[in-house]
From Swiss-Prot:
Annotated pathway: Amino-acid biosynthesis; L-arginine biosynthesis; L-arginine from L-ornithine and carbamoyl phosphate: step 3/3
UniProt similarity note: Belongs to the lyase 1 family. Argininosuccinate lyase subfamily.
Gene assigned in the entry: argH
Gene3D superfamilies the record matches: Fumarase/aspartase (C-terminal domain) (1.10.40.30), Fumarase/aspartase (Central domain) (1.20.200.10), Fumarase/aspartase (N-terminal domain) (1.10.275.10)
EC number: 4.3.2.1
GO biological process, any: arginine biosynthetic process via ornithine
UniProt entry tagged with the keyword Amino-acid biosynthesis: yes
Catalytic activity, reaction form: 2-(N(omega)-L-arginino)succinate = fumarate + L-arginine
Designated name of the protein: Argininosuccinate lyase
Name of the top EC class for this enzyme: lyase
Length: 468
C-alpha cells in the first residue's frame, strides 16, 4: 500500500515501486515507529481529534501491533513501500480503516522518519558505548597484569624509547573513552524531537510537539520545522563517530598483527580467536585483527557516502534522504560484530614479555636518555643532542649498543660523558626517569590505570542507559 495516490490517475510503475521500497533496511525502526504513533495518538486525543473511545481503540490496536512485530507474527510485505506504510496496514487490520486512518492527521513521513532515526541512533550510541567501555576495561586489566614489563616504544616504526607495555596498552584505551564521550556529546544534539514538523511547515491542528517529545524520551522538540525535517547533520555526526571507532580499532589491530608475526613474537593469540589456512597446516592467522583493519575502510566509506548524499540538498525534505539510513545501519551492524570479537581477542592474548624486554633497549633507544642526562649536567640540549648522536655513531661503527661502549670510549667522545652516565643506560632506568604526569614511569602508569578505570566508571551511566 502507499500513503499517497488521490492526485494520481494510476499506481506507480513496477520499476518505480521496486526503486522506492525500503523495508529491507528500515524495518529495524518498526518498534520506534509504533512508539511514535502511540505518542502521536496521545496528542490527537488531547487536541480533540480522537474521542476517548477512539483513543482507547487506537492504543489497543497499536499495542497489539507492537506485540505482533516483536514476536515476528507481523512483517512487511512486498507491496509495502516502507516501514511506515507496512505498520499503517497493520494498524488498519487491527483497528479498522476508519479508525486506523485517523492516525495520519497532523504528521508526515518527513517528520516521522527523522524522529524515529534520532531515537534509534540514541539507543545504538548507548549500546556501542557500553561495548567500547568493555574493551577499554579489558585493556586496563591486561595493563595491570603485565606489571612493569617493558617494550620498545616506536616512532616511524623504528625503535624510539623504552616504555612500559602497560603504557602502550593504555594508549589504545584512552581513544575508546573519547569515542564514548563523542557518542555522549552527540546525544545532546540527537535529544530533540522533530515530531510535529509535518512535511516542513508544522501543523495547523493544534497538536503539542513537546508532549510527543516527552513521550518519546526527548528533552524538547525542534525550534524550526524546516530544519527538523531536513537536518541530517546529527546522522552524519553519528557516522563520523562510528568511523572514528573503526580507525581506533584498526590501529589497535594493526599493532596486534605486527606483534603476532614470528619476527616480533610479542603476543600469542588464543586459538578460539584465530583461524587457520585451507592449504598450509601450520598457519594460525589473526583474522579478527585483519577484519577490523579492513572494516575500518568500510566504516569510513559509509561516512563518505552519506556526506556525498547530503551535499547540495535544498531545503527541506528530498527523497535523497532515504539514503541516510543504510550507511549508519551498516556501521552499527559492523561494530556490533567487531567489538565483541576484538574484546575477546585482547582479553585472551598472552604477551611474551621476555621477548619484548630483549628488544626494548636495542636500536639505540636510550640515546635520548644520554642527551637528557647531559642536560641535567648543565650541557645545552643542542650540544647534548650532538654528543649523544656521536655515541650512537661510535657504537654503530662497532656493531654494538650504547651501553656496550667502554668508559674510555665515552670519555674519548667528550669528557663530560663520565661513568655516571651509565645510570640512564638501562631500560629500567630510562623508564623510571619518565616520572611526569602522562609518562611511562611505573608509578605514573599505576596512577593512570586507576584514572582510566574511574573514567570508565563515570561513563557507565551513559553506556548502560536506555532511551524510552
Amino acid at each position: 500500500m502507499a500513503l499517497w495516490g488521490g492526485r494520481f490517475s494510476g499506481g506507480p510503475s513496477e520499476a518505480l515501486a521496486a526503486l522506492s521500497v525500503s523495508t529491507q533496511f528500515d524495518w529495524r525502526l518498526a518498534r520506534h515507529d509504533i512508539a511514535g504513533s502511540s505518542a502521536h495518538a496521545g496528542v490527537l486525543h488531547a487536541a480533540g481529534l480522537l474521542d476517548d473511545d477512539q483513543y482507547e481503540g487506537m492504543m489497543k490496536a497499536l499495542n497489539a501491533l507492537e506485540e505482533d512485530v516483536v514476536s515476528g507474527r507481523f512483517v512487511a510485505q512486498p507491496e509495502d513501500e516502507d516501514v511506515h506504510t507496512a505498520l499503517e496496514r497493520g494498524l488498519m487490520e487491527r483497528a479498522g480503516k476508519d479508525l486506523g486512518g485517523r492516525l495520519r492527521a497532523g504528521r508526515s513521513r518527513n517528520d516521522q522518519i527523522i524522529a524515529l532515526l534520532r531515537r534509534y541512533l540514541r539507543e545504538e550510541a548507548r549500546s556501542l558505548a557500553g561495548e567500547l567501555l568493555g574493551l577499554a576495561h579489558v585493556l586496563s586489566r591486561q595493563a595491570e597484569d603485565v606489571g612493569d614489563a617493558v617494550i620498545a616504544g616506536r616512532t616511524h616504526m623504528q625503535h624510539a624509547q623504552p616504555v612500559l607495555l602497560a603504557h602502550q596498552l593504555l594508549a589504545h584505551a584512552w581513544p575508546l573513552l573519547r569515542d564514548v564521550q563523542r557518542f555522549r556529546d552527540l546525544d545532546a544534539r540527537l535529544d530533540c524531537s522533530p515530531y510535529g514538523s509535518g512535511a516542513l511547515a508544522g501543523s495547523s491542528l493544534g497538536l503539542d510537539p513537546e508532549a510527543v517529545a516527552r513521550d518519546l524520551g526527548f528533552s524538547s522538540s525542534v525550534p524550526n520545522s524546516i530544519d527538523g525535517t531536513a537536518a541530517r547533520d546529527v546522522v552524519a555526526e553519528f557516522a563520523f563517530v562510528a568511523a572514528q571507532v573503526g580507525v581506533d580499532l584498526s590501529r589497535l589491530s594493526e599493532e596486534i598483527i605486527i606483534w603476532n608475526t614470528r619476527e616480533f613474537g610479542y603476543v600469542t593469540l588464543d586459538d578460539s580467536f584465530s583461524t587457520g589456512s585451507s592449504i598450509m597446516p601450520q598457519k594460525k592467522n589473526p583474522d579478527i585483527a585483519e577484519l577490523a583493519r579492513g572494516k575500518a575502510g568500510r566504516l569510513i566509506g559509509d561516512l563518505a557516502g552519506l556526506m556525498a548524499s547530503l551535499k547540495g540538498l535544498p531545503l527541506a525534505y528530498a527523497r535523497d534522504l532515504q539514503e541516510d539510513k543504510e550507511p549508519v545501519f551498516d556501521q552499527i551492524d559492523q561494530l556490533h560484530l567487531l567489538l565483541p570479537a576484538i574484546t575477546g581477542m585482547v582479553d585472551t592474548a598472552v604477551f611474551n614479555t621476555d621477548r619484548m624486554a630483549e628488544m626494548a633497549g636495542q636500536g639505540f633507544s636510550l640515546a635520548t636518555d644520554v642527551a637528557e642526562w647531559l642536560v641535567r649536567q648543565g650541557v645545552p640540549f643542542r650540544v647534548a643532542h650532538e654528543l649523544s648522536g656521536a655515541c650512537v655513531r661510535g657504537a654503530e661503527s662497532q656493531n654494538k649498543e650504547l651501553a656496550d661502549l667502554t668508559d674510555q670510549e665515552l670519555i674519548a667522545i667528550d669528557p663530560r660523558l663520565t661513568p655516571q652516565v651509565r645510570e640512564v643506560m638501562t631500560v629500567q632506568g630510562s623508564v623510571r626517569s619518565r616520572a611526569g604526569r602522562g609518562g611511562t614511569a611505573p608509578e605514573r602508569v599505576a596512577e593512570q590505570i586507576t584514572e582510566l578505570r574511574e573514567a570508565i566508571a563515570g561513563l557507565r551511566s551513559f553506556g548502560e542507559a536506555e532511551t524510552r
